[in-house]
Regions:
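Short, charged juxtamembrane terminal tails flanking transmembrane helices
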Residues: 385-392
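A structural signal for hydrophobic alpha-helical transmembrane segments in multi-pass membrane proteins
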Residues: 33, 37-49
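Alpha-helical transmembrane segments of multi-pass membrane transporters
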Residues: 154-162, 346-357
Length: 392
């Protein structure tokens, strides 16, 4: 089975409340507790890039995020099917939470020598096994029996990575990530059900989590600086940029995605969910994390040029977020939002030269201005479409 990208017409998208497809519940407090560990995981993965602001550090951070996000997403699918009012499922989710917590503890030191890469792999194996067994007796049992063996194989590869030299470990992680993300092409995604309301809300919270972590990290980094102007102006520019990223997803995209996913036939919905909230979302989350590190670097070099990869992280992360958001929209609506792609190209074209030849502050201001411009552009387009629809 090949998971072809679905296309659903965008016209007549409902604009009301996020639909609760299939009787899905809202996100429960235990899931929010689980998400606290994901906050920690994102912080730790960002630390890898902060401490190693070079192509190798970026590759390692991206691979660790890809591996982590695969199973975080898997747990979102799991809780979509679990009855968390029962003690057994609660304990299984808490056991998975413990596995994620140990993984997160190990992340920064897993890239170097010592036992931490083995600890990361062992915890990951626990997370995968808990995920498999927790699905038993749920609506996704048939689906996990198809995909579970591939998850187990990739987890064993992650564990094996801990026994190779740090220089070669990145290649083993790459193999594990590749195995995971091509799994749907091998096993298919049949056998799962997607309750739309809970599923969309769950993933929206992940975006909030990563955006919140980025604001916290930027604020903490700026607070260690002595220059008042740098701290205040830099922090506010970074906050405005993060707010624009929030706006671009939550102003309309989340609600529209729920309506579009609801309209996909139930048997095709897992594929649509995989393409939009799986593949596209990975790069969306990665874009926010990279942009957050780039904001920190830009504030650190607020009055001076910033060369090398650190000078590209801010525009690269923002452009990646916009491109991923465009791909997310394409996976569900069937068309490419050109305004986002144009702005992504503009951010790269303006942001990198500004960082390298002017200053971090200039680049941060330019990037924030471009994002604000995109927000205004999209808002004006939506108002125009609404007026045309009303007059028709």
């Amino acid at each position: 089975m090949t998971p072809d990208s679905p296309a659903v017409p965008q016209d007549d998208v409902p604009q009301g409340d996020v639909p609760q497809g299939g009787g899905a519940e809202s996100v429960r407090s235990l899931e929010l507790f689980f998400d606290l560990v994901f906050v920690f995981a994102i912080t730790q993965i960002a630390t890898v890039l902060v401490e190693h602001p070079n192509p190798g550090g970026l590759a390692r951070a991206a691979l660790l995020l890809a591996i982590t996000w695969w199973m975080y997403g898997g747990y979102a699918w799991l809780t979509n099917a679990l009855d968390l009012d029962r003690t057994g499922p609660r304990l299984m989710l808490l056991l998975g939470t413990a596995g994620f917590f140990v993984m997160s503890q190990a992340v920064p030191r897993a890239v170097g020598p010592g036992p931490w890469a083995v600890v990361f792999g062992a915890a990951y194996l626990v997370v995968v096994l808990v995920h498999f067994f927790a699905f038993q007796g749920t609506s996704g049992q048939r689906g996990i029996h198809r995909i579970g063996p591939y998850n187990l194989a990739s987890a064993l590869v992650v564990l094996a990575a801990g026994f190779v030299a740090p220089e070669q470990r990145v290649w083993v992680w790459a193999l594990a990530g590749l195995m995971e993300w091509v799994t749907p092409w091998l096993s298919g995604v049949g056998g799962f059900t997607v309750g739309v309301g809970h599923f969309v809300e769950r993933h929206g919270l992940a975006v909030i989590i990563v955006l919140g972590e980025s604001v916290t990290e930027v604020g903490a980094a700026a607070s260690h600086l002595d220059d008042l102007t740098t701290v205040l102006v830099g922090s506010l520019l970074a906050l405005a940029a993060s707010a624009a990223l929030w706006w671009l997803y939550f102003d309309r995209e989340e609600e529209a995605s729920a309506a579009l996913l609801e309209r996909v036939p139930a048997e095709e919905r897992p594929r649509a969910a995989l393409w939009s909230f799986g593949y596209a979302y990975l790069f969306l989350i990665l874009g926010i994390a990279v942009a957050a590190v780039g904001m920190q670097k830009a504030i650190d070099s607020f009055r001076h040029p910033l060369h090398g990869l650190p000078g590209a992280l801010l525009p690269l992360g923002v452009a990646l977020y916009l491109a991923a958001l465009a791909a997310f929209h394409r996976a569900l609506a069937g068309d490419w939002p050109r305004r986002r792609l144009v702005t992504a190209a503009a951010v790269l074209a303006a942001g990198v030269p500004a960082l390298r030849w002017s200053s971090g502050g200039t680049a941060l201001a330019v990037t924030t201005a471009l994002l604000a411009g995109l927000v205004c552009w999209e808002s004006a387009a939506q108002r125009g479409a609404a007026l045309r629809s009303r007059d028709a």
